[in-house]
A protein has these predicted regions:
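Noncatalytic, solvent-exposed loop/strand surfaces
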Residues: 1-222
């Protein structure tokens, strides 16, 4: 629907509503009519940023045309010009944020959108989009990528092949991080029985949960 709502949860009232207006998306391969896996429109859950110097907060929302919007949490007004962050109708998943960098992931190749991790530094005047592509499998975690305590961004890769010497990381987990202005692979995990899992369509599809436990940092997915 390309709508964002701010709701007072105590009063049960809508404080403001923002609808994103844009021309029909013409880039990419176009939507597959009737395909529930590529619905088009806004599919990424917005995220609220930390307090800024003036004591306000920004809501970051990715509209269905592939543009990232910067909204005032107090009233929903645009704080700056929206910027491109992926293809329109590209089925981006929930946004996440770490030290001023916003992340999202994509799957299904909707409208020709590559299946990869996406990042954009909101403090970069150029708003350069950074990506890492595992070259196999969609990144299916509905709540996007998870961030560990070191700033590495983790996402599961769907059914695909694992050929690390060809930088192909399907059917596993990839951990990326922004280094020197680029989103780079830092680590990955691949089940020893990945081919067996692929054959049975048992790939990992859940955004990881990351938490501390007894002097370790654990990550759980499924």
């Amino acid at each position: 629907s390309d709508n964002v709502y701010a709701i007072d949860v105590e009063a049960g009232k809508v404080i403001w509503q923002k609808h994103f207006e844009y021309q029909p998306v013409t880039e990419g391969r176009g939507l597959r009519e009737g395909d529930p896996l590529c619905p088009g429109g806004q599919t990424a859950t917005p995220i609220i940023g930390p307090l800024n110097a003036s004591g306000g907060r920004t809501v970051y929302a990715l509209a269905g045309d592939g543009k990232l919007h910067f909204l005032n949490l107090a009233d929903g007004e645009e704080l700056e010009t929206p910027v491109k962050f992926g293809f329109g109708n590209g089925k981006s998943y929930a946004l996440n944020m770490w030290n001023g960098v916003i992340f999202t992931t994509t799957s299904q190749g909707c409208n020709g959108n590559p299946n990869q991790v996406w990042a954009i530094d909101i403090h970069d005047p150029q708003k350069k989009v950074m990506t890492f592509n595992p070259k196999s499998g969609g990144l299916w975690g509905r709540t996007g990528a998870a961030v560990d305590s070191t700033g590495r961004v983790w996402a599961p890769t769907g059914d695909g092949v694992y050929i690390p010497e060809q930088h192909t990381y399907g059917n596993g987990l990839i951990g990326t991080k922004v280094v020197d202005g680029q989103l780079q692979l830092q680590d990955w995990f691949e089940p020893s029985n990945w081919a067996w899992l692929k054959k049975r369509d048992l790939d990992m599809q859940v955004t990881p949960s990351i938490f501390p436990f007894k002097n370790h940092e654990l990550m759980v997915t499924g």
